[in-house]
Amino acid sequence: MAIQHPDIQPAVNHSVQVAIAGAGPVGLMMANYLGQMGIDVLVVEKLDKLIDYPRAIGIDDEALRTMQSVGLVENVLPHTTPWHAMRFLTPKGRCFADIQPMTDEFGWPRRNAFIQPQVDAVMLEGLSRFPNVRCLFARELEAFSQQNDEVTLHLKTAEGQRETVKAQWLVACDGGASFVRRTLNVPFEGKTAPNQWIVVDIANDPLSTPHIYLCCDPVRPYVSAALPHAVRRFEFMVMPGETEEQLREPQNMRKLLSKVLPNPDNVELIRQRVYTHNARLAQRFRIDRVLLAGDAAHIMPVWQGQGYNSGMRDAFNLAWKLALVIQGKARDALLDTYQQERRDHAKAMIDLSVTAGNVLAPPKRWQGTLRDGVSWLLNYLPPVKRYFLEMRFKPMPQYYGGALMREGEAKHSPVGKMFIQPKVTLENGDVTLLDNAIGANFAVIGWGCNPLWGMSDEQIQQWRALGTRFIQVVPEVQIHTAQDNHDGVLRVGDTQGRLRSWFAQHNASLVVMRPDRFVAATAIPQTLGKTLNKLASVMTLTRPDADVSVEKVA
């Protein structure tokens, strides 16, 4: 199905604040976030429509939280299957690892299956909310150049017409074969897996069993995944000497499917495609006024479903910083923290994905035997087994430097980690997720205390100019105690008791949360002012105009 934006009228020449190359998921998320921040954005896409065939099939809790930040999560959820377990099977069908993480610390299920084209369509439609965002399809980026204060892009339409775009910044979301990255000669180091995989998508799921199964068969490893809307995906390793053309032949496709279906002739094929798995990482994510994101910056095997989710992390990390710089609220040195924070974690996710692929299809037969033996031994080590089955091995993003203020012992500090998102009770009695109360803003969140108490008038002025929300968390039973109200502070009740537990664990009563929901700093009321001054310096924040209104509550 062709998916195109109905309200977009192309122009010959364009002048915008941000140009985004690529209307894939990362480019669309960047455009939605920047759009809601009032930034003038132009997305240019080489294809004439969104890609309409399934690619990624796993979306995690962090990516859903990112969707929530741009007001689209409720439209995305109908295209997901929550709590999607991953089960590893021996060649005889014995389940030796059942990964079923049941935590929802960030407000959403940790593992979910999804249909990418439908979610991409939700993000594209989301752009129609913003008159300051345009998306042009069938535009090939032929060349670009950087000047001191802008980037000039040269485009060619499908009819051969030329167009010019002048932008303050260019975000390259143009995929693993990124034209932008290659033009800038940014090394893309890593390796390509020797084996290819053929992906077969089938409508009216002929199995209809839930979850995803990875069968570690040394003869031909395969994957069977239940997807939303009754779609079944099979992935089979392409063996040496086989070609895509051969496997597409009806008799060979029937032979493949007979491995997993009792009646391989009675299926509704959607499509078959052969993929090569790459593990590569760009040496640099920022080159002056050009920033690389998503597959243009890193690509990884599919086995942990983290390629898509890593791209969402890029978009969430970069978009708020870019908005602050364009709005004049921070200097462009803030953008250097994008690579500083995201590159190491992208590398960790690449390594995890490669390892998972080696578990499914070990390069050596003896490694498969070792894997099966270790999995059997884990049954006698319940704590170790839970570590794997609850997916605690997944490297959670943690930043040790960048746009944050870390003091004291780094190992146990919450600074640089994503803040939790429990349910909270508002003063009108409504119960909602924490981010819904905050919006796409900074937040200073205090347990029991007035978060403005330790701030000077100048600090209140500076942080309010950023759109910061000041939140006082109280036990839910205290939410209607009127004498505790403070002007300019939103009071919320700790519905589930999770915020109290978080503050008790981390020996702090105040947390500064960034727009991407990461903890930028912690403090107590008497140290908050000093901490905010240091944080403003680290983030290269500028001083607001003197006419910004100030309310100081003692």
Swiss-Prot record:
E.C. number: 1.14.13.127
Keyword Plastid: no
UniProt protein name: 3-(3-hydroxy-phenyl)propionate/3-hydroxycinnamic acid hydroxylase
Pfam families: FAD_binding_3 (PF01494)
Family listed: Belongs to the PheA/TfdB FAD monooxygenase family.
Alphabetical list of HAMAP family matching this protein: MhpA
Xref: InterPro entries: 3-HPP/3HCI_hydroxylase, FAD-bd, FAD/NAD-bd_sf, PheA/TfdB_FAD_monoxygenase
Keywords: Aromatic hydrocarbons catabolism, FAD, Flavoprotein, NAD, Oxidoreductase
GO MF: 3-(3-hydroxyphenyl)propionate hydroxylase activity; FAD binding
Superkingdom, natural source: Bacteria
Functional description taken from the UniProt entry: Catalyzes the insertion of one atom of molecular oxygen into position 2 of the phenyl ring of 3-(3-hydroxyphenyl)propionate (3-HPP) and hydroxycinnamic acid (3HCI).
UniProt-annotated binding residues for FAD: 17-46, 285-295
Stored NCBIfam families: PRK06183.1-1, PRK06183.1-3, PRK06183.1-5
Source organism per UniProt: Escherichia coli O139:H28 (strain E24377A / ETEC)
Reactions catalysed, as given in the entry: 3-(3-hydroxyphenyl)propanoate + NADH + O2 + H(+) = 3-(2,3-dihydroxyphenyl)propanoate + NAD(+) + H2O; (2E)-3-(3-hydroxyphenyl)prop-2-enoate + NADH + O2 + H(+) = (2E)-3-(2,3-dihydroxyphenyl)prop-2-enoate + NAD(+) + H2O
Cofactor(s) in the UniProt record: FAD
Pathway listed: Aromatic compound metabolism; 3-phenylpropanoate degradation
One BP term from GO: 3-(3-hydroxy)phenylpropionate catabolic process
